[in-house]
From Swiss-Prot:
<dbReference type="GO" id="GO:0005216">
    <property type="term" value="F:monoatomic ion channel activity"/>
</dbReference>
<keyword id="KW-0735">Signal-anchor</keyword>
<keyword id="KW-0812">Transmembrane</keyword>
<feature type="modified residue" description="Phosphoserine; by host">
    <location>
        <position position="67"/>
    </location>
</feature>
<keyword id="KW-0813">Transport</keyword>
<keyword id="KW-0472">Membrane</keyword>
<keyword id="KW-1032">Host cell membrane</keyword>
<comment type="similarity">
    <text>Belongs to the influenza viruses matrix protein M2 family.</text>
</comment>
<dbReference type="GO" id="GO:0055036">
    <property type="term" value="C:virion membrane"/>
</dbReference>
<feature type="transmembrane region" description="Helical; Signal-anchor for type III membrane protein">
    <location>
        <begin position="26"/>
        <end position="46"/>
    </location>
</feature>
<keyword id="KW-1133">Transmembrane helix</keyword>
<feature type="topological domain" description="Virion surface">
    <location>
        <begin position="1"/>
        <end position="25"/>
    </location>
</feature>
<dbReference type="Pfam" id="PF00599">
    <property type="entry name" value="Flu_M2"/>
</dbReference>
<keyword id="KW-0945">Host-virus interaction</keyword>
<feature type="topological domain" description="Intravirion">
    <location>
        <begin position="47"/>
        <end position="100"/>
    </location>
</feature>
<keyword id="KW-0564">Palmitate</keyword>
<keyword id="KW-0449">Lipoprotein</keyword>
Length: 100
């Protein structure tokens, strides 16, 4: 039997056979798993959108960064520039390295 014959004789399932058998189910396990799945998806999307803010908050707590009390202003500015450059590098996920 050739491949063409097999394709021609294959019978597609009717629409009723394709439908999900658990749609409209009031089974508590199905409802709970659906809610957990939706919450997981929402949290994952929020994590991807705001991961820098979230993890920076976890790292430094509610403060904006490490304490600069008693540190001269010039050193504070240098530290801010270092932190900003580290964040800027993270934006692209790639770092260009030039070999001389």
């Amino acid at each position: 039997m050739s491949l063409l014959t097999e394709v021609e004789t294959y019978v597609l399932p009717t629409r009723n056979e394709w439908e999900c058998r658990c749609s409209g189910s009031s089974d508590p396990l199905v409802v709970a798993s659906s809610i957990i799945g939706i919450l997981h998806l929402i949290l994952w999307i929020l994590d991807r959108l705001f991961f820098k803010c979230i993890y920076r908050r976890l790292k430094y707590g509610l403060k904006r960064g490490p304490s600069t009390e008693g540190v001269p202003e010039s050193m504070r500015e240098e530290y801010r520039q270092e932190q900003q450059s580290a964040v800027d590098v993270d934006d692209g996920h790639f770092v260009n390295i030039e070999l001389e």
